Amino acid sequence: MRRAAGTSAALLAALALTAAPAQAAKAPDCPDSVKAPSAIVIEVSTGTVACARQADKERSIGSTTKLMTALLTLEEAKLSQTFKASSYRPSSIESQIGLQPGERMRVSDLMRGLLLESGNDAAMALAQGVSGSTKAFVRAMNRRARRLGLSHTHYDNPIGLDGAKNYSSARDLVTLATVLRTNAFFKKVVDSPSGTLKTGVRQRTFRNRNTLIGKFPYVNGVKTGHTRGAGYVLVGSASRNGIQLVSAVLATPSEAARDADTIALYKWAFPRFQRIRAVIEDRPMATAQIRYRSGAELKLVPDRTIRRIVPRGHRQAVSLKVDAPSVVEGPIRRGQRLGKVEVRQGGKTVATVALIAQSAVPAAKIAQKTKTAAQSPWVIGGVASALLLATVLLAVRRRARLTRRRRPRQTSAA
């Protein structure tokens, strides 16, 4: 089976912040406008927890269990594959897409049925199609949870039915959703008000059970859940002005309460972050002297702009490390890479930008090199030393001649 690239090193570093106990201790409690017993909202690019309430408490999570079902499917199967409906028969009160015995459907459509309609029959078809059996798939779910560091999560089924061994926490759900959002197909589906399943024995169209999609333009995901034991659960996401949030509310008493709590989290969290330009394209960040051209300098500029999210009023959370030459020599073409800038945040390098020549520098002419060489302190010092030595030698020779002239002549006796 294939392994999809869903978790980059940079992303996992950010996710580690959401799971760190120290970070949890620093996170403020959620505002009074949020009534959910367990809630959390994070800023995705840094993993900063805007607020948290009982975020690590283990609770029943209903159909948000299907987020792990989705992740394993995206990592282990191709969207173009076709899976056969399982023998699982959901009861009339379970959410389902109406798969018929032996019906075959493309994985992409089963995923739409899983994420939009929350179909239990779609979940079982995916589980058995990926791992061969439900038990094998559940084992894989728990292995994946451990690798992601979801320390308050355990799965007992790929659907989300209530059970003592099927639970998670608000923080773990947010971590899982953040990983899933790196997948373009997932992001598109969960941000759709509806979806049409075109394969199978008949065409089916379903509305997204996350009714915030389409109602609030900035909401762009993710997944609802509901059982008697879980109450009403919503793992959500929202984006505004380049700031991406992911949230979770657990154990709310109704759909209305679930939605109200989620929107309250966003209204509270968005103003607490700002997007800054840490590095600005074509703005000089270093200068280098140009060899053989007295007083001339070359400006070095970033080749692109880097934007970062920081807590509002804390631009100093981002620092820059400039690595550039102090002296350059032509020929240098405009745009030639000569150095770099490292953007650091949270004690880590989060981006590296090339420093390029803002203008061209022609090769120095021989006359310039000669003139510069003649003006060099080393050359001047050398000439001065040579003149001094010559003067000393002349003085010594002159004194020697005078000494010889002054000596009396010696005559021999007869």
PLM segments and residue spans:
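Secretory targeting and sorting signals
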Residues: 1-24, 381-398
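Proteins with a high burden of low-complexity, intrinsically disordered sequence enriched in S/T/G/P/A and R
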Residues: 6-9, 16, 28, 33, ...
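Basic side chains
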Residues: 2-3, 59, 66, 144, ...
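Active-site-adjacent loops and short helices of periplasmic peptidoglycan-processing enzymes
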Residues: 22-188, 196
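Domain-terminus/edge residues, biased toward the C-terminal soluble/receptor-binding domains
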Residues: 151-154, 162-167, 171-409, 413
